[in-house]
Amino acid sequence: MGLEGSEKLEHEIEQVHDNIENRKEEVSTLQDMANDLEKLTDHIEATYIGRGVPHDHAKTGSRKPSSGQLIATMQNEIDRLKKEGDKVSILLMQERKKRKELESAKNNLLNVYDSLKMQKASVSSMVNRKQRAAKEEQKIQEEFERQITDLLEEQQQLKLEIERLEAETERANSETEQYEKQKEALEEEYEELRNECLKHDPQLDAEIRTLQDTFEEVERTLTKQVSDAKIADKPLKDSMFNSNSEKEKIMHALEKAEKDADIYSEFIQQYMEQLESSLEKSSTAIENAQNRLAEMTAHLAESSDYDNDDDTDGIINETDYELDTSQSEFATLTTSSNKSILNES
């Protein structure tokens, strides 16, 4: 049942209590009336009937008519009062029965009231639990809403950051393309400048030709040594049964040819190593020049036109100096190699 039903039941119980109290008062009143009638009846019987015949009546042998009428009247009144008393007794019994019924109904209603109070307490506790659960759920929902709001704000910030990074990436790609184009242009200019320097440097051409002649001379020498070894080997085979002196001469010639071949091969190996070292130095110088050109490219992007021209001239002069240094080292190495070959020959 709900709260309204319990309140209605309480009101009905109060009405029953009031009815019981009213009935109690009525019963008490009727009981008092019955007691009064009984007392009056007893008094009348004791006065007129239980008293007996008076002495003057016995002497005369007669009664006054008024006394008989009075007795009859009193008897009638007593009968009437008895009937009234019986009625009152019946009513009293009925009222007692009603009182018992009302008390039973009251007890039932009290039991129902207690049950309703227990149900009300249970419902109240359940409502309180529901309210607490609703408050907790509301708090959790508010926390989720706050987290969702924070995530949405963070998502918006990330979108803005992504857009900014994309714009920066596009700008960086554009700048990179421009730098690549500038680099290609500078490399082309550097190649043209290097070719121009090589073209206008007769000493370098002469050294290259000298190196080619040296290689040809070494090749001819090795070819001659191989042919001499073959020529010396043929009479050795033909004169297997000749004297020991001839064999020793031939063996000595072969040993000398082998030693000469070893010396030439070792010299050529050393010469090739020196040549590779010189070429590595030249490559390093060229790479340094390219790095300086890259630095010049970066510097060109940040400096004014007038300053760029001065720096460009300085870097070109330094590059020419490095190339001249490499060429001079290469020429020195070639000259020393030629001298060594001539001394060995």
UniProtKB/Swiss-Prot annotation:
Residues 304-323 have a biased composition (Acidic residues). One of its GO terms (cellular component) is nucleus. Residues 324-345 have a biased composition (Polar residues). GO terms for biological process: actomyosin contractile ring assembly actin filament bundle convergence; conjugation with cellular fusion; mating projection actin fusion focus assembly; mitotic cytokinesis. Residues 1-24, 296-345 are annotated as: Disordered. This is Uncharacterized protein C4H3.14c. It comes from Schizosaccharomyces pombe (strain 972 / ATCC 24843) (Fission yeast).
